Amino acid sequence: RLETCGKPVVAALNGTALGGGLEMALACHYRVAVNNPKAKFGLPEVKLGLLPGGGGTQRLPRLIGIQNSLPLMMEGKELSAEKAKGAGIINALASDNDDMMKQAREWCQANPKATAPWDAKGFKYPGGDAKHPAVVQVLAIAPSMLRDKTKGNFPAPENILASVVEGSLVDFDTGLDVEARYFADLVVSQVSKNMINTFWYQLNALNKGDSRPKGFDRSEVKKLGILGAGMMGAGIAYVSAKAGIEVVLKDVSQEAADKGKAYSEGLLDKGMKRGRVTNSQKEELLGRIKATDKVEDLSGCDLIIEAVFEDRDLKASVTKETEAVMDANGVFASN
């Protein structure tokens, strides 16, 4: 109805549009979004064992092409506003809400008889439909690659592929019927029911703390000790310091401990080159990581994580050594 109402319809997006939200936007004639770095755009239904059942498997391929749209739907990728615009999903970016509404009104005034591309006479798929030689080359190997990856246990990507391919060979309205049949096949399957239960209901319950012991206050780690500055220890140190936790990274020698801390520095340097990390942020994070070979520096840690080499005697040794300096209410964990 939006597409064929005879009036220009613009989707003004001031935040995230995933799943049905983006499908509604795709049914509009134009999409303008606020360039909010936290906003995400995509069709992630495959993560729940489903396919985009609101026209997503028909509109997105007709908008950006079969080859470009399949990875977004079959992998459930979520894009930033800038990447969504680069992919052709978003038509324009706005600096704020006022700019977004201004652009939306201007586009409506400039396009009083807007129609969706696929409703225009002579419409052709960007990059070709499923019969185009370039697309055929991809589709010829896609099923076998998909089967190798899913082992036949994950039907959603297969149904997405089938819906897109079959839908490209018929008119748009018939394509919606094709999509509806493949969606119905998934929504009643045990696979999707299990995935929805696990990744929606159970995960939301976990995030709300339903599995936490009752009658205990929430604990907070302010100082974390890590035994072993190898790959695992260095990685734990980085993510912990990034979360604002003071970290003591201990190894058998100062050189080894410094090498573990250097891992965090390397990641931050890469972030600076990409413009995602400032120098002050880098220094602040590195300042939270104390590399040491002295067990005394672990004193006062709320949590100590053992991440040393998989050797029973070594693990026993570092555990015994650490017990002497552990906080009375501290927790000792093994990675």
Task: Annotate each language-model stretch with its function.
Residues 2-48, 52, 228-236:
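Glycine-rich beta-to-alpha active-site loop
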Residues 139, 255-259, 270-334:
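Rossmann-like NAD(P)-binding element
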Residues 182-195:
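Long amphipathic alpha-helix in the N-terminal Rossmann-like dinucleotide-binding domain
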Residues 12-13, 44, 227, 235, ...:
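Structural motif
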Residues 207-270, 290:
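NAD(P)+-binding Rossmann beta1-loop-alpha1 motif at the extreme N-terminus of oxidoreductases
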Residues 57-67:
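Hydrophobic, secondary-structure "cap" segments at the distal end of domains
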Residues 1-14, 56-59, 195-219, 283:
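An acidic, glycine-rich surface segment that forms the CoA-thioester-binding/catalytic face
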Residues 23-29, 67-182, 199-201, 205, ...:
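Amphipathic alpha-helical segments at domain termini/boundaries
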